[in-house]
Amino acid sequence: MKDTVMAYLLENSIKFKGKPNPKAAMGKILGENPDLRSKVKEVNQVISEVVKEIETMSLEEQQAKLDELAPEGLGQKTERKRKEIELKNVKGNVVMRFAPNPSGPLHIGHARASVLNDFFTKKYNGKLVLRLEDTDAKRVLPEAYEMIQEDLKWLGVKVDEVIVQSERLETYYEYGRKLIEMGQAYVCDCDADEFRTLREQGTLCKCRDTIPEENLKLWEKMLAGELDNVAVRLKTDIAHKNPSIRDFPIFRIERTPHPKNGIKYHVYPLMNLSVTVDDHLLGMTHVLRGKDHIVNTEKQEYIYNYFGWEIPEYVHYGILKIEGPVLSTSKMHAGILSGEYSGWDDARLGTLRALRKRGIRPEALYKLMVEIGIKQADVRFAWENLYAANKDIIDKDARRFFFVESPKKLVISGADSRKIDLRMHPDRSELGNRELLFDGEIYVSDDLEAGKMYRLMELFNIVVEKVENDILYAKYDSDDFAIAKSNKASIIHWIPVKDSVPVTVIDENAEKIEGFAEKDFAVVKEDDFVQFERFGFVRIDEKVDNGYTCYLTHK
């Protein structure tokens, strides 16, 4: 591992005139070496050690070492081919579904299920159904019906058919009635706490032995809105080792007006009934779900068996552990209503809209979710892997600029005015050049100390003389980089005061970072990606007044 890390850091250091940038190197290391993505802590430790070694080398020594470690250049080695994930028992046409609740737009957790279903239906030339599970009126956000479809389109998920459960209530009633007629379901008016106690004891409730004819009468009264505080329960094994499976409910009374149905209906199916009926009628061949649904799978198999239906192939994958942004839809919605969050695309949220706003490309997220796959072990969502994949996509088109955050004015004496031409991109001359004009007054972001030497990137060496009224004063010292190196001078980037462009960068915590970019930054357009050198990649959000608002994508 050390030689690999050393090679990438040497390449990075040479690019930056002898000073390695660990964060930038980390992204490339992980992006081009997938086998190291699970060893981020170890890689970080090795980077720290290697940086110390590199800082003792001259540029010539760095180049010689890089030639020794990677004579054919980095990224030339053949990457080990990853085995493509597959479904079991594929026979004929594959039909799958992605079934979110329309309580808000999609977030990162939804991305896994939607991407994997899309991946498999494309792989096997199958059909993907988007099923909006909106039978709980209290959890429905009306605008989410459209937002979810917009999010899937952005992510590259191809939906072949859209099903809305609240539009299928009569179908669920039909199968609920059949279960009652078969004597496999009954209307229960037991108090919830009373039933819970009986269930824990494995004792039958008084309603269980009601004959089907009487249950059908009660069922009709439920549909007519004449009953409250009743439920329809499915007969299972009252002695089942898992109490939650014992006679679980499949219909309930719900008086909350529904965004689509208003108060037309009072009886709504619970998930295990509606999901089973839909999966059968829509011809699902394979169902992907988290392993937290294993109990639901067992519950649904009772219904399959009562009707004699073929059970689809279930795939239960591990939990995706996501740290960082807010994922709870209810918390996000409450925060938006209170003004805590600016909207569903607030940078602090884990929605796909927030990732899009920050500049995450859908191809990067899609690729990562396929790599995570359907393994049963729980998985930690590695942000660094997403960022590495995203960098692979945007780096080739991202023009480079200097950006000075929290700017401080620096006046330099003893130096002639000069013009510097730099490439917009180190590897793509066709993207053109940018021009910096030094005329004695610049902005810097670093806190400079009086008496110390500093190297202005791509310019010359200075020595700071004093700080007065928040303005820094320095004198020109020399052009020679070797002098800066021998004095261990820090290299700092800078912006000419004249023609500087005001920029606000919003980071992942929704904090605003104010600063200036160089004058040629004004060529950018909305949705462009650029790299602010030694700061990070940003997405251009909008032009405001005489400046720009950008979102920090990642380092």
Curated annotation (Swiss-Prot):
Function statement: Catalyzes the attachment of glutamate to tRNA(Glu) in a two-step reaction: glutamate is first activated by ATP to form Glu-AMP and then transferred to the acceptor end of tRNA(Glu).
Protein name: Glutamate--tRNA ligase
Pfam entry (one): tRNA-synt_1c_C
GO CC, one annotated term: cytosol
Residue stretches spanning the membrane: none
E.C. no: 6.1.1.17
Alphabetical keyword list: Aminoacyl-tRNA synthetase, ATP-binding, Cytoplasm, Ligase, Nucleotide-binding, Protein biosynthesis
Reaction(s) catalysed (UniProt annotation): tRNA(Glu) + L-glutamate + ATP = L-glutamyl-tRNA(Glu) + AMP + diphosphate
UniProt feature coiled coil, ranges: none
Source superkingdom: Archaea
Species in which this protein is naturally found: Methanococcus maripaludis (strain C5 / ATCC BAA-1333)
Molecular function (Gene Ontology), one example: ATP binding
Span of the annotated motif 'HIGH' region: 100-110
Localization of this protein: Cytoplasm
Enzyme class: ligase
PROSITE patterns: AA_TRNA_LIGASE_I (PS00178)
GO BP annotations listed: amide biosynthetic process; glutamyl-tRNA aminoacylation
Family: Belongs to the class-I aminoacyl-tRNA synthetase family. Glutamate--tRNA ligase type 2 subfamily.
Database matches in NCBIfam families: gltX_arch, PRK04156.1
